[in-house]
Amino acid sequence: MNRIQLIFNEKWAMAREDYYNLVSLILPSIHSGNFKEVEAFFEKDTVTAYASDLNFVGRWNLEDSGLPSDSVAVIVLEGTLYSWETFRLQEYIAQAAANDRIAGIILWINGPGGMITGLDNASKMISECPKPVVAYIAGACASAHF
């Protein structure tokens, strides 16, 4: 199932108004047959990650071999949480948990919620992570983000 179909067929955990706002952004393109524009809209990453260290300026990839010891993984959840982004979140948590140079994880959150697919697994990964995981709320933390 492609991402456009998922928008209309998945279950959501977000305010109805936020869902309608999302749909109102893509419906004009769908009605005009401009599916490439809609797909491009959903290609934007809403979950990203990097590692940082208090003693050094800069950011590293989570799996960078030059990452300083005792670094912290920062996983950013910005905007609507789509199911494919939840799977990316799970990948980042697994990478951070497996990296001996990463001491803990910060979830930097600002979003209205999103699709519920994969949230149960992501929640389990967070609660069972062998490293400390904390959340920093940088705005909204609603529904699926919570």
Residue locations for each model-derived region?
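N-terminal organellar transit peptides
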Residues: 1-144
